[in-house]
Amino acid sequence: MASLKALKVRITSVKSTQKITKAMKMVAAAKLRRAQMAAEAGRPYAERLDAVMSSLASKVTVGPQSPKLLAGTGNDQVHLLVVATSERGLAGAFNTNIVRAARKTADSLIAQGKTVKFYLIGKKGRAVLQRLFPGKIVHQVDQSHIKNVAFSDAHMVAEDLIGRYSAGEFDVAHLFFAKFQSALVQEPTELQIIPVPLTADTGAAATGASAAVEYEPDEEAILTELLPRNVAVQLFRAMLENAASEQGSRMTAMDNATRNAGEMINKLTIQYNRTRQAAITTELIEIIAGAEAL
């Protein structure tokens, strides 16, 4: 049985930890509101741009002269997995879920005989992916200096990715991030960003929504300008979603930790009181026994 001194030290330690987790929860809650508003504000623009891209692409014939970001390389052998995680931990299963989704896709592609490479945004996924896929990480973007995500941050990453794509380093790029649903729910999401995916359904829907629209100059010229921007916009959206998801997950994790600390303090306090009571009882018995001996 633990001594009274040891129990008292442990109770003090848990109370100190509880204060820290409670403070982190409050900070995450304050940041969550701002991050959530930014993520929700960015969705309509990204979705509308995607619809415009589909509308434009449905009006052109994809061929050798089409923009490479639309037509692709003509191959799908080398896949680059762009994994966006956080720079800091203590965010529950936020980073784990994103890495798990990327790992699942990587395993599936490798099983099909494809070559897989990783491009990391944030440092929290590096250790696991380096261990599971040694030598496959081609680059890591350091975001430790970023307090609030800006479009310029996403634009720099987009330029680097497009440059690598143009240089023939990969054929297809998949983006992994956590789509924010609520403080309790963040959905791991995979999105192909290079080449721009255009399904028959989205193309038809976009065509129907903008059937009366005429483009000047021609659609292919506009696509040449918009395709790189679309990559940056999708990256920016993912970063905003990640920022909100990270704070939501951290707030929930710290709330759980605070409540667990409270329960542990209660249990330790009960154990402390019982131990103290037992010690007092033992002393009384010894005093009474000594008195009777006299």
UniProtKB/Swiss-Prot annotation:
It is found in: Cell inner membrane. Signal peptide: none annotated. GO terms for molecular function: ATP binding; proton-transporting ATP synthase activity, rotational mechanism. GO terms for biological process: proton motive force-driven plasma membrane ATP synthesis. This is ATP synthase gamma chain. Gene3D superfamilies: 3.40.1380.10, ATP synthase, gamma subunit, helix hairpin domain. Keywords: ATP synthesis, Cell inner membrane, Cell membrane, CF(1), Hydrogen ion transport, Ion transport, Membrane, Transport. GO terms for cellular component: plasma membrane; proton-transporting ATP synthase complex. InterPro entries: ATP_synth_F1_ATPase_gsu, ATP_synth_F1_gsu, ATP_synth_F1_gsu_CS. CDD domains: F1-ATPase_gamma (cd12151). Produces ATP from ADP in the presence of a proton gradient across the membrane. The gamma chain is believed to be important in regulating ATPase activity and the flow of protons through the CF(0) complex. F-type ATPases have 2 components, CF(1) - the catalytic core - and CF(0) - the membrane proton channel. CF(1) has five subunits: alpha(3), beta(3), gamma(1), delta(1), epsilon(1). CF(0) has three main subunits: a, b and c. Pfam families: ATP-synt (PF00231). Belongs to the ATPase gamma chain family. It is a peripheral membrane protein. Its main location: membrane.
